[in-house]
Amino acid sequence: MSVVNFYGQLSNTQQFDQIRINIASPDQVRSWSFGEVTKPETINYRTFKPEKDGLFCARIFGPVKDYECLCGKYKRMKNRGITCEKCGVEVTVSRVRRERMGHIELAAPVAHIWFLKSLPSRISTLLDMTMRDVEKILYFENYVVVDPGLSILQKGELLTEEELQKAKDKYGEDAFTASIGAEVIQQMLKELDFSKLKQELYEELQTTSSEVKKKKLVKRLKLVENFLESENKPEWMIMDVLPVIPPEIRPLVMLDGGRFATSDLNELYRRVINRNNRLKKLIESKAPDIIVRNEKRMLQEAVDALFDNGRRGRAAKNANKRPFKSLSDMLKGKQGRFRQNLLGKRVDYSGRSVIVVGPELKLHQCGLPKKMALELFKPFIYSKLELYGIATTIKAAKRMVEAEKSEVWDVLEEVIREHPVLLNRAPTLHRLGIQAFEPLLIEGKAIQLHPLVCAAFNADFDGDQMAVHIPLSIEAQLEARVFMMSTNNILSPANGRPIIVPDKDIVLGLYYLTLAFDNEVGAGMMFSDLAEMEHALYNKFITIHTKIKYRRNQLNAEGKMVPVIIDTTYGRLMVGELLPSNPNIEFKFINKQLTKKDISLVIDLVYRHCGQKATVIFADQLMKLGFKYACSSGISFGMDDMVVPESKSTHINKTQLEIKEFEQQYSNGLITYGEKYNKVVDAWSRCTDRVANDMMKEIATLPVNDAPNHQKINAIYMMAISGARGSFQQIKQLGGMRGLMTKSNGQIIQTPIISNFKEGLTEFECFNSANGMRKGQIDTALKTASSGYLTRKLVDVAQDCIITEKDCGTDKGIEVKSVIEGGEVIVPLAEKILGRTAAIDIFHPVTNDLILNKGELINEAKLEQIESAGLDRIMIKSVLTCESTTGICSICYGRDLATGTLVSEGEAIGVIAAQSIGEPGTQLTMRTFHIGGAATKGAEVSSVDASYDAKVKIISRNVVINSEERKIVMSRNCELLLLDNHGNEKARHKIPYGARLLVDDGDMVIKTQKLAEWDPYTIPIITEKSGKVLFKDMVEGISIRDVTDEATGIPSKVIIESKQYSRGAELRPRIQLLDAKGEVITLSNGLEARYYLPVGAVLSVEDGVQISVGDIIARIPKESTTTKDITGGLPRVAELVEARRPKDHAVIAEIDGRVEFGKDYKSKRRIIIHPIDETMSIEYMVPKGKHVVVNEGDFVKKGDLLIDGNPVLQDILKVMGVEVLANYIVNEVQAVYRLQGVKIDDKHIEVIIRQMLQKVEVTDSGGTTLLAGEKIDRHEFDEINEKAIKNGLKPAEAQLILQGITKASLQTRSFISAASFQETTRVLTEAAIAGKVDKLRGLKENVIVGRLVPAGTGYFMDKMRKAAVKLDEENV
């Protein structure tokens, strides 16, 4: 027996390794068929038997009943294989009616609509005609000249009926041949000589210079090559014979009441057969041409409707005016074959019920209702009953179970013992949505769930339901126990932190337990053992909050027990008792008021140092303790717990005065409406925060009147500070003031809600508040769908990303450093490199000791060494630089976050990455409505303060001193660094153009000193010389307009769009500075002093006035602020991973050089960059209205922005390369999630980026068969080049391209995966023509063909099977 047969025994299906798709030839269709369907009848309405030669004919498709012919002459198994001589039916199983096909011989050829109408149309591309023309021929509107003969007509020219008649009169009947219908298209396709055509196209491609023509030729050439390679014949796109799918797949069902329900396909087939039969008769009876032609057209339309109803013309509809579901519709969309039946299946052995909390369960257990268990485990019970001789037969066992005899329950107990069940809660957004538990039988009808796993399932007990599934085979049980047991899923795969963390009331209980109060009874007493303390507590000598001293034995580094005396409380010691003994887990970690964060850290520590088992036990005991004290603490929620601060009115009055001042400035015309809006919103924002802070201070310390020595602690404050429930956001609204509200479009309403919920809202406030609330509700409804869609796209693009080897051996890596924003370290380096591997050997900068070897995993211990060495950037390996040809290697990926060890082979990291990014998206969209539309907006940054005592260093310092002796920054890329004594960078701040510098290069500053300040709401345009103002190209009403403010009546001059006027097309509004002689002043960089003004700029000077250095001549208002929340964020993530061009995108400088403004072209401004080495300068055309962030004469670096906005990802890739691009995408995506406090590991985003960078675009074909402009898989390209180099040819050249995830999914190597994703018909059409082969490497295609996925255990089965095949080959 060969080795591979052993694997074949696992299933009785045929073993195959790849699937190929082709166009079926007419002969192939006939070979599949078991007979021709010639009649449109289905079944006889009296006998209910299928009609002979009809759509359900038993002779063609097989018997209706097992082993029984139609007339009943042959019955039973003994006659198997006999064909009845009376009715012609073969005696066999009725199952063959699911697999036997028939066919219809068409009386006239018919075009296949997929090849005609699926864009780009394959038939028209091959014939080099337009699709419209081909349709005219096919649908009998025009004739086409096949052979011009003696006439001057062109081959392929279209003629109408009249033109044909005229041509016949002119040249004679037989001078030329013109024809019509699918026959002629078929003939034209047959006549194509592909080898010759390929040669001609190649030559034409070399000679043509027109880009449009090149594109067209490349398309046609690609198609010709596809046909040559796949050995498909082009005439097969026109069908002579039509396959009929098996009848069981298009069933006819009898309903009660004698009516029939039928599949739409039967109706569509009937139309085809009717028209085909009619056409046969017409041709036989030599009917007039016009009638035959009409019938042929009808036949073509009937076949079109069968294949893809509604693709062309009006869809065929049924009696209820609903379009019929055609064959294409059977495959397409969520309800199609792919997504409904192949990727998602209903599961037997499953049940569902409501969940309730089970606090006395252990972490690996769940409570399963007895009734449910009995039903689910039936087969196991039957076999056991029979085995023990309790029941004699299965039938008897069945009766016993139905009667619920007492023996049955005993057997059930035994069957269930150590047989894990899977619990699943929909929506399953990440892999922790399905986990395995050991069932405990319980009374009642609800499933009991352990409280600690709720976070992973995102379950609560307000009526949630969960499904139970039973793993049946031993292998399945084993996998459930090893991989899916809840105790094996302690860490979240998204960020590697514990997900089994106490929550809600457990946290509250532990917080209460670890509180320590001064002035409690027995303060300062000393104890040496716990029993003694318990005694003291019982006799009320101390309370659990009393501060006491205690002698505790602790493990030291050598593993010996040493006694130490600690200051603590009895409550904290109770938690301390639960800690596993380990020198790394010190008592100090819990000797404090425990909040949710602290508890999470302790669990993390326990997991890292003591392993999984200890963690599970610890978490379970912690939960029980938390529940106990949450109950006995008696914490409640009272009206008096909401405290309104005394200072509230003062803050509000102060802010109202500020706003009056802004109104005044606005009335005087000093600021625009937009600026006023921004300032008002900002002032209220600050006021709300101040009130909230005062309230928090008052709540935190609250003396109670009746017992002066007691310090009670506020219940609401406890809930929030411990992290149990509620946020300070919500408390602020209860006791402070509700603050600003958002409108439904995300804009902030200027008047805030001054009241809070305790005082109650006024009518007007209530209305405003409802507006914000409604936004939250609507958001939730709309965004959930788009978030789910994003997850689906991510899974689809990354599904074939699997760990396939240990080490790919690459030397490449990426450099990471901590993320600094506004001078603050937001993400420390440690967080970015934990769990990654080093790309190079890393040495200590001072001692030069080796810290890390190349390829070594950076764990917590190594992290400490790196931090103490003070390294600020590190080269790590990354998925992006991994050189594995299929999949990714373990070393480049690093730590598997769910286990904390190096990732193992076969791990499906692509799916995990997609789930990690998608899951919080869905979560966050659902969380919006909790805060109820209150605006969360950070006040705009308008100054920089020193965060350390340090020395100032200024990069790109370019300042002028204005008339008030202030230093004004003139540089666009000025940066201010703070350095410590060793010259190491501690903070870095970007100083915007126009800011006032308050310190200078080399100054020493102290912490909190102000370094620079600026107006955050406008971008100024500043002069660097004094002179007289001269307005140029400012034509009233065309390029400039006096805008009179409605509120104040004060006019201000604003630059407007001048494109729409013919006179305005050439205008470039600018201000020039003249000297005393009236000549234009020259600036320091040698250019003239002229300042171009963008659309929307507000002038601050009048024509002809004298101004001095550093004066503002115009201001560009920034748009008003809208709230930042994830809804702004999710579309941003989608925009990034879809690689879309952002609206109003930035322009990036491609080289280093000096900026010059060239001559304008129509409505565009010309920006020219001259490089230093005087090579080719680069020109950019930008719309005139856009604000250019560089001035003439500025020096820009490669990658700098010339225009504000989000840069186009493709530009970053082209100019700055892969690493910068990846860094940009990672940071942008992380910024969205960070705003919501969601942590996702960078590597997940990197996996998605790797999938987006799979393809290259050929720039030069060299000696290969590739075409310039062709897009091809990176690895495929490398393979082709290797072959070329072997054969001594010039290799092709190509550049990496970035694809959006949708496009990348549709262009994967696997056509099955692409077809099940989107645009099914197009994908299948393309694949069939090219004769594509699916190697079945991804997860999706394997699920669809019904094999084990090549990931996890399936990966090793696959590997072993391949090894077995190899062994067999060697043995042979």
Curated annotation (Swiss-Prot):
Question: Which Gene3D superfamilies does the entry mention?
Answer: 1.10.132.30, 1.10.150.390, 1.10.1790.20, 1.10.40.90, 2.40.40.20, 2.40.50.100, RNA polymerase II, clamp domain (4.10.860.120), RNA polymerase Rpb1, domain 3 (1.10.274.100)
Q: What is its EC number?
A: 2.7.7.6
Q: Which SUPFAM superfamilies match?
A: beta and beta-prime subunits of DNA dependent RNA-polymerase (SSF64484)
Q: Which domain of life is it from?
A: Bacteria
Specify which residues bind Zn(2+) 2 according to the UniProt entry for this protein.
C808, C882, C889, C892
Q: Where does Mg(2+) bind?
A: D460, D462, D464
Task: Give yes or no: UniProt keyword Cytoplasm.
Answer: no
Q: Does the keyword Ion transport apply?
A: no
Cofactor binding mode and count: Binds 1 Mg(2+) ion per subunit. Binds 2 Zn(2+) ions per subunit.
Which top EC class is given? transferase
What is the catalytic activity of this protein? RNA(n) + a ribonucleoside 5'-triphosphate = RNA(n+1) + diphosphate
InterPro entries assigned to the protein according to its UniProt record, in alphabetical order: DNA-dir_RpoC_beta_prime, DNA-dir_RpoC_beta_prime_bact, RNA_pol_asu, RNA_pol_N, RNA_pol_Rpb1_1, RNA_pol_Rpb1_3, RNA_pol_Rpb1_3_sf, RNA_pol_Rpb1_4
One record GO biological process: DNA-templated transcription
Q: Which GO terms describe its molecular function?
A: DNA binding; DNA-directed RNA polymerase activity; magnesium ion binding; zinc ion binding
Q: Which residues bind Zn(2+) 1?
A: C69, C71, C84, C87
Keywords in alphabetical order: DNA-directed RNA polymerase, Magnesium, Metal-binding, Nucleotidyltransferase, Transcription, Transferase, Zinc
User: Which cofactor names does the annotation list?
Assistant: Mg(2+); Zn(2+)
A Gene Ontology term for the protein's cellular component: DNA-directed RNA polymerase complex
Task: Look up the coiled coil feature and give its residue ranges.
Answer: none
Q: Which family does it belong to?
A: Belongs to the RNA polymerase beta' chain family.
The subunit field of the Swiss-Prot or TrEMBL record says: The RNAP catalytic core consists of 2 alpha, 1 beta, 1 beta' and 1 omega subunit. When a sigma factor is associated with the core the holoenzyme is formed, which can initiate transcription.
Role played:
DNA-dependent RNA polymerase catalyzes the transcription of DNA into RNA using the four ribonucleoside triphosphates as substrates.
Which PANTHER family does this entry report, sorted A to Z? Answer: DNA-DIRECTED RNA POLYMERASE (PTHR19376), DNA-DIRECTED RNA POLYMERASE SUBUNIT BETA (PTHR19376:SF54)
Would you tell me the protein name for this molecule?
DNA-directed RNA polymerase subunit beta'
Q: Which organism is it from?
A: Rickettsia rickettsii (strain Sheila Smith)
Write the lineage as a comma-separated list: Bacteria, Pseudomonadati, Pseudomonadota, Alphaproteobacteria, Rickettsiales
